[in-house]
Amino acid sequence: MCVDALAQTAPDWNRLFDTAAGQSGYFTTKQAADAGYSTQLLRKHIQAGRVSHVRRGIYRLVHFLHGEHEELITAWLWSDRAGVLSHQTALSLHGLGDVLPSWVHLTLPADWRDRRLRVPAGVLLHHADVPSAERSWFGPVPATGVRRTLSDCARGGLSPDELRRAAEQALRRGSVTRNDLADVDAALAPFGGLDG
């Protein structure tokens, strides 16, 4: 066997650590395999207390402090980092309105619509393509930007009072202009409009 082949398959703790460090201590089975860690080796690290199993296919280096958005990070990693936090979840991340989402809203690419997925408990899926220009980052996870978030919430049936409050806050902060809020205006038209 070639020495180069051995070097490629040897576990690389630094690589795994660097990957996890960029994701608040979390990593996936695939990311571990890319760093040379088999599931058997992960089990040994779990037994040794260096790694914890979070959910199917997702692990955490135990010496990282727990953060405030762990359920969001694990939902994003579950999507193989293809998803974007959206709707009420993104609204909450942006600090708009008073919504306390009971679900993690995650938008997956449109071509994932027909995939049969084992969706984690507490995650609500949406399907649409979200370009990079319409994303904001909150630590290690992406969420839809303010304009896209308000549009998604307007089309997704957020209560008129919450939608109006969030849109007014975004306008006051200068995060959006009135021209960015066509979907919000349309959703609020039967309820007196944005100024109602």
Residue ranges and their predicted role:
Residues 1-85, 111-120, 128-132, 138, ...:
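Short beta-edge/loop segments at beta->alpha junctions of small alpha/beta modules
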